[in-house]
Amino acid sequence: MNNSYTLSPCRGFTLIELLVVVLIIGILSAVALPQYTKAVEKARATEALSITSNIVNAVETTILSSGVYDSAVYADPENWDISLSGGYWQDSGCCGPMYVTKNFFYLTREDMTGVGAYRCKGTCTGNINDESIYDLWRCYPSVDGEKCLLCFSQTEQGKDICKSLTSLGVEYRP
């Protein structure tokens, strides 16, 4: 009886083949990750544009239905017919009511010029002094006589986002 075992020839991957696969995955990641990050931020900005539109429409509707064109209408979200989720209202301490979400705070100006959406670095704390990556601004049509939608930024990341939003009708102002 023969107790010797014969090994069947097994062939695995060579080190070079494994390195090539890792290199290809690295290159794909380096190309895809910035595009993915940009797409996620553009989606966040689109959500902010939707919320600013809802706030502007609620204020404009309140003005038209009440016939009152006064800063008191702008100063109190209780006057508006609006339902927003994912955040909370608070007093900004300087400029009017503020709606705070995880990524943005929205400021409705008592000077009746419009609604700003400020993209916080990190999680928003509800502090008016939170540093922003970029700012979106939507004017009240009844005040300005036209619809305006602007994006401002002091950071390179924010400038790139502002430029990518021009396809949505946002005017970039450096």
Regions found by a protein language model. Give the residues of each.
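Short, exposed beta-strand "edge-strand" segments with a Pro/Gly-rich flavor and a Y/T-containing core
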Residues: 8-12, 69-72
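A ubiquitous, low-specificity "background" feature that marks scattered single residues
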Residues: 8-9, 23, 53, 66, ...
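Periplasmic/extracellular, small/polar-rich flexible segments of pilin-like filament-forming proteins
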Residues: 66-174
